[in-house]
């Protein structure tokens, strides 16, 4: 191989490596952090509200994806966790840890529960027998009508309520005890913010954020005070 050809190849490789490095650097610089604070009507932080971000660059993905499979337990006549967040198409495993039978019946949450045309899914889970493990049942949230929030209840025990939220956007999170949902490495540019909370029957107004290298914070205040959880 001639020296001229070697020089040409080396120059080409150097240019490629430089372009790759610049691309990675630009990608890093284009990532920003957005914190969304959710408050109730009285200005107190709200835990377990779902915050969904839709960035203008819809091809960008978070470093940590939403779980493709979750387990929801029925225990002490409660759904645990009370709110589950998954992507559309996720598998949800239901398990009854109580010694008596339970149902799982679903319907759209919010105002949709009053005029739902989709009956949702229904399951009957046998009670856990001493010395034997509970038998789980799986549901895949891949059908029309499961997008967004789904209310879960029990025919036998009317006080039982739980929710599963299926998000189309991969940028979604539940608020922590301080009422905060923190999104890192969001692509820069405009982003839509949607907040869902179980007791807010009418969705809160969507907000818009401008994501950049400078950390940003948006505050969303609900028009309700969520019911206190039963422990």
Locate predicted features.
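Short coil/turn motifs at helix boundaries and re-entrant loops, enriched in small/polar
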Residues: 23
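N-terminal signal peptide c-region/cleavage motif recognized by signal peptidases
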Residues: 26-29
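Compositionally biased, intrinsically disordered low-complexity segments enriched
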Residues: 1-17
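Extracytoplasmic copper-binding redox domains, predominantly the cupredoxin/blue-copper superfamily
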Residues: 31-231
């Amino acid at each position: 191989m001639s020296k001229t050809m070697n020089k040409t190849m080396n120059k080409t490789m150097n240019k490629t490596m430089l372009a790759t490095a610049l691309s990675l650097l630009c990608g890093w610089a284009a990532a920003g952090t957005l914190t969304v604070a959710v408050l109730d009507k009285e200005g107190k932080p709200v835990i377990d509200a779902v915050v969904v971000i839709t960035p203008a660059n819809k091809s960008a993905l978070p470093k940590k994806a939403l779980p493709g499979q979750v387990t929801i337990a029925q225990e002490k006549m409660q759904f645990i966790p009370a709110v589950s967040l998954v992507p559309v198409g996720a598998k949800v495993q239901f398990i009854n840890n109580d010694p008596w039978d339970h149902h799982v019946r679903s319907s759209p949450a919010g105002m949709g529960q009053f005029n739902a045309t989709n009956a949702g899914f229904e399951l009957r889970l046998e009670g856990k027998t001493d010395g034997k493990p509970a038998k789980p049942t799986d549901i895949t949230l891949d059908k029309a009508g499961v997008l967004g929030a789904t209310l879960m209840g029990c025919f036998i025990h009317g006080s039982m309520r739980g929710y599963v939220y299926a998000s189309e956007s991969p940028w979604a999170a539940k608020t922590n005890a301080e009422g905060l949902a923190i999104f890192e490495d969001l692509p820069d540019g405009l982003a839509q913010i949607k907040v869902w909370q179980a007791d807010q029957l009418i969705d809160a107004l969507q907000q818009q954020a401008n994501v950049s290298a400078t950390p940003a914070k948006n505050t969303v205040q609900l028009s309700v005070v969520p019911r206190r959880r039963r422990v």
